[in-house]
From Swiss-Prot:
Organism: Arabidopsis thaliana (Mouse-ear cress)
Identification of the protein by name: Probable hexokinase-like 2 protein
Catalysis performed (reactions): a D-hexose + ATP = a D-hexose 6-phosphate + ADP + H(+); D-fructose + ATP = D-fructose 6-phosphate + ADP + H(+); D-glucose + ATP = D-glucose 6-phosphate + ADP + H(+)
Record bears the keyword Transmembrane helix: yes
Keyword Membrane carried by entry: yes
One Pfam assignment: Hexokinase_1
Length: 493
């Protein structure tokens, strides 16, 4: 090779190296710019979701105001609370075998359990989950009653023993995921507030339909309590174990809270309530809305595109049905504006409600160095096969912001209920919490507990005890069955 050729080769190599260096520098700078933009989106989102103690108290006070308004006026505030005439709650002395039914969306859960009295734990709990056929879902309530009765016959045949000659009580609860199922659907019946005689008659007719069906199928089981939200069943379970149980909260796919109110505080339904009497109230707090709620652009777009825009605002911020969707929307914006997952937008990231709260919880609670669970879930859920560690860290941070806000708002709701009862400084108050978010999402649960402690401080926080539900999912129906005296009985006395 001649001297000239050598010079040309060296020059070409130098130019190539310089060009490669320039391109590499541009790539690095572009990557840094994208990461900075991602961080800006994250910081803005976290700032808008922030729930300092002052914000939590503002939310709690607004909830108290709406609860008070709902008890005194027909249309005032964001809540339309429901009074549940479940009769006397358990005392802890109840004994024997009891039966329960829990209607949860398109599924039916049948239960049987034994209470030993003396506040002994429920035992021998047997459960059987059954899908409800579409024709039954879209049929009349009588058709649903016949389906339930037939399945109860099978359930007892599969689980023999414990039957007696006397008629047993049946508790019937509805989980928040219940959907509209026909013109006489459970979901529409559940929202009856017993505000007038027609509504009361509807509920009595439902109980009668169920009992007629049970008798027709030869079952020595009768429904003596009204159809109630599952949260009220959990409250009954809490009362069985401790007389200081005053409220119950459901934090699963949906959310609700129920508490025990004094009859003299309820003027809206005064003609239907005899005093003195403790009344169980379903707050329907999923409908709660307030200017103090930390609503972001992602919450606003989720609500606008939902099937019920403008409604269930609190539920859309705290329940398992929506938390994963909020995370998805944030990640989508990051992917569109800062190429979080590369230059090509992952198609599945654009699919609404593809990310469920269990997957979100798994990513959030991943403590491995390489965020291996996050990597696995990104592949499984979104089809993102090649994510960087930095991107996976961002995913965890987004999950943390969403979960922390939800849990702390739920904690503020709990404090608000206790404040409404005037028990913050005076008495021990036990609140039962049930649902997948609380039961299986450890970080969410910790955030909820810490928010209550932060709001109340060392001294007052000792007065509020938060406990898991008793007997497992939907066991509240069994405790309602143990109550014995239901709405029908109380009306006939």
């Amino acid at each position: 090779m001649t001297r000239k050729e050598v010079v040309l080769a060296v020059t070409a190599a130098t130019i190539t190296a310089v060009a490669a260096g320039v391109l590499m520098g541009r790539w690095i700078r572009r990557k840094e710019r994208r990461l900075k933009h991602t961080q800006r989106i994250l910081r803005k989102f976290a700032r808008e979701c922030a729930t300092p103690v002052s914000k939590l108290w503002a939310v709690a006070d607004a909830l108290v105001a709406d609860m008070t308004a709902s008890l005194t006026a027909e249309c005032c505030g964001s809540l339309n609370m429901l009074v549940s005439f479940t009769g006397s709650l358990p005392s802890g002395d109840e004994k024997g075998v009891h039966y329960g039914v829990n209607l949860r969306g398109k599924e039916l859960l049948l239960l049987r359990g034994t209470l030993g009295g003396n506040e002994e734990p429920i035992s021998d709990v047997q459960k059987h989950e059954i899908p409800i056929p579409d024709d039954v879902l879209n049929g009349s309530f009588k058709e649903l009653c016949d389906f339930i009765s037939l399945e109860l016959v099978k359930f007892l045949a599969m689980n023999p023993g414990g039957e007696a000659e006397e008629v047993k009580n049946l508790g019937f609860t509805l989980t928040r995921s219940v959907e509209q199922i026909g013109s006489h659907s459970i979901s529409s019946i559940h929202r009856k507030s017993l505000a007038n005689d027609d509504d009361e008659k509807v509920l009595k007719d439902l109980v009668n339909d169920m009992n007629e069906s049970l008798e027709t199928h030869g079952l020595k089981i009768r429904m003596n309590t009204a159809l109630v939200d599952n949260t009220i069943g959990e409250l009954a379970g809490g009362r069985y174990y401790h007389k200081d149980t005053v409220a119950a909260v459901s934090l699963g796919m949906g959310t609700n809270a129920a508490y025990i109110e004094q009859a003299q505080e309820i003027s809206r339904w005064k003609s239907a309530i005899r005093e003195p009497q403790e009344i169980v109230v379903s707050t329907e707090w999923g409908d709660f809305r307030s200017c103090h709620l930390p609503i972001t652009e992602f919450d606003a777009s989720l609500d606008a595109e939902s099937l019920n825009p403008g409604h269930r605002i609190f539920e859309k911020m705290v329940s398992g049905r929506y938390l994963g969707e909020i995370v998805r929307r944030v990640l989508l914006k990051m992917s569109e504006e800062s190429a979080l997952f590369g230059d090509t937008l992952p198609p599945k990231l654009t699919i609404p409600y593809i990310l469920w709260s269990p997957d979100m919880a798994a990513m959030h609670q991943d403590i491995s160095e390489e965020r291996e669970t996050v990597n696995k879930k990104l592949k499984e859920v979104f089809g993102i096969m090649d994510s960087t560690l930095a991107a996976r860290e961002v995913v965890v941070e987004v999950c943390d912001v969403v979960a922390e806000r939800a849990a702390r708002l739920a904690g503020a709701g709990i404090v608000g209920m206790i404040k409404k009862l005037g028990r913050l400084e005076k008495k021990m108050s036990i609140v039962i919490v049930e649902g997948g978010l609380y039961d299986h999402y450890r970080v969410f649960r910790n955030y909820l507990h810490s928010s209550v402690w932060e709001m109340l401080g060392d001294e007052l926080s000792d007065h509020v005890v938060i406990e898991h539900s008793h007997g497992g999912s939907a066991a509240g129906a069994l405790f309602l069955a143990a109550c014995g005296d239901g709405h029908q009985d109380s009306e006939s006395k």
